[in-house]
Amino acid sequence: MIEAIAHWITNYISTLGYPAIFVLMTLESALIPIPSEVTMPFAGFLVSQGYLNFWVVVLVGTLANLVGSLGAYALGYWGQEKFVKKFIKKYGKYVLVTYDEVETAEKWFRKRGELIAFASRLLPVVRTFISLPAGFSEMNVFKFSFYTFLGAFIWTALLTWVGFTLGERWDILGIYFHKFDVFIIAGFVILAALYVYRKVKKIKKSND
C-alpha cells in the first residue's frame, strides 16, 4: 500500500513541484493519511538536484500543514457535539473508547495544549489526527496556530534536510513506515464510509 502511495506522490511532485507539496501536506494535516515522510524527503531530493529551493519547500510544507490542521481543528471545534461525541457515546465501546476517556483527554489538552500541539507535530501518524482534540478542547486558535506552525516548521525542515542529505537514497525512510499501512488503509476505509453515509442520507432526505 505504502509503495503505491509513494509512487503516486513522487510523480505528483515531479510534475507540479511546489503546488503538489502544498496540496499533499494540506491533506496530510486534514486527517487524510498522506505520509509527509515521503513527500518532504522526496522534495529534499529534488532540492539536491537543483529543481527546487530548500527554504521555499520548507515554507510551503509548513504553511500547508497549518492550513490542513486548521481545517481539522474546525471539525473538532464545531462538530464535536453533533458528530464525534455522539458517535463515541453510541459506538465507543466497540472501539474501546469511552465518553469519559474523551472528556479526560480534553481536560488534559486544556491544561497542556500548547506543549501537545507542538510536540505532536514531530510524531508520525499522531500528527495527522492531533488537531481534532485541539478543536474538542476549544484551544485558543491563535495559540494552536503558533505552536502548530512552529512544530510543523521543524518537522518539514528535518525531513527536507534528510532527503537533501541522502540524495538518491531518500526513500530509505520508507522501510520504517511499512508498519503504518494499517492506518493508511483504515483512513481510506473511513473516508469511503463517510462518503457512502452522506450519499445515503441525501437519498433518504430526497425521498422524504
PLM region spans:
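Transmembrane alpha-helical segments of integral membrane proteins
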Residues: 158-169
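Amphipathic cytosolic juxtamembrane alpha-helices at the membrane-cytosol interface
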Residues: 141-146
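Membrane-interfacial helix-loop-helix
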Residues: 1-22, 50-132, 136-139, 168-189, ...
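Alpha-helical transmembrane segments of multipass membrane proteins
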Residues: 22, 29, 42, 129-133, ...
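Short amphipathic helix-loop junctions that connect adjacent transmembrane helices
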Residues: 10, 40-48
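Transmembrane alpha-helix interface/packing and boundary motifs in multi-pass membrane proteins
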Residues: 22-40, 120
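Hydrophobic alpha-helical transmembrane bundles that constitute the permease/transmembrane domains
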Residues: 125-129, 149, 153-156
